[in-house]
């Protein structure tokens, strides 16, 4: 998709007239959020005249970029209830992307720790009820 296409779809959904330069900013913010959450390095749009975006499939662009842009447009005009619906949809779709990120995001767009698994020690957080640390070994 191009910025012009994303702008047209988003304006149609929101019944607003956001400019392509504003939409480019919103799309880049969306891509940055995806990059942070997925440990990816998807490229940003550098101008409104950039060619068709190919780092994600058009399906993923439709379910991520469009709801996020619609959310941003509605936040800008103060329609908080509508904005909330769009951000909920974006978050649901982002969660799906994160579950399927190995097939959705190409290897050339992955950070070093893209598939890292972090282990935690759950015993370090026990400090409630019977397990309260009272200086007597937890008893």
Regions found by a protein language model. Give the residues of each.
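Conserved short "hinge" loops at termini or chain/domain junctions
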Residues: 1-56, 103-139
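Short, glycine/acidic-rich hinge or "gate" loops at secondary-structure transitions
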Residues: 43-46, 82-87
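Short, hydrophobic/amphipathic alpha-helical patches that form generic packing surfaces
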Residues: 63-75
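Short secondary-structure subsegments characteristic of cysteine-rich extracellular domains
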Residues: 84-98
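Charged, low-complexity interaction regions
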Residues: 18, 76-80
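Structural motif
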Residues: 54-64
């Amino acid at each position: 998709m191009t910025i012009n296409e994303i702008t047209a779809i988003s304006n149609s959904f929101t019944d607003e007239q956001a400019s392509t330069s504003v939409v480019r900013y919103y799309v880049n913010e969306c891509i940055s959020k995806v990059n942070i959450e997925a440990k990816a390095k998807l490229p940003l749009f550098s101008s409104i005249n950039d060619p068709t975006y190919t780092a994600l499939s058009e399906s993923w662009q439709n379910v991520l970029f469009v709801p996020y842009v619609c959310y941003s447009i509605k936040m800008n005009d103060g329609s908080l209830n509508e904005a909330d619906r769009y951000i909920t949809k974006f978050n649901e779709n982002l969660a799906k992307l994160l579950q399927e990120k190995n097939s959705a995001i190409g290897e050339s767009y992955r950070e070093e720790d893209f598939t890292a698994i972090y282990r935690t020690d759950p015993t370090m957080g026990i400090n409630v009820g019977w397990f309260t640390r009272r200086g007597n070994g937890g008893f």
